[in-house]
Amino acid sequence: MKKKIRLASVLFMATLFLLACTSPETAEEQNENIHIVTSMFPVYEITKEIAGDQADISVMVGANEDAHHYEPSAKAVASVNEADVFIYSSDEMEFWVESLLAVVENDDLTVVESQG
């Protein structure tokens, strides 16, 4: 009888030890930053200043590219599909945004026009 109690106690203690050593959150759960895609570099810079380290921010049109003549690549469309927020300047500045959003399949995407 004492052996059974001792064995049960050891198993119980081992279980508690293992449970105490496990992490309740995975690395993905710990990184809860929102993913923001911006259309061009000035919008990226402003967004970066506002969001700080609370968001992962990427830019579609680089600093040395022309936003008027930009054509979104498949990689850019995929990036917007995976984003939480897409921020662009205006329809007049980036006429390609309308066609981009037409092919994006992310129903949870928040789209922000930063005009003005």
How should each PLM-predicted stretch be described?
Residues 4-9, 20-116:
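Extracytoplasmic metal-acquisition and chelation regions
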Residues 12-18:
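Hydrophobic core
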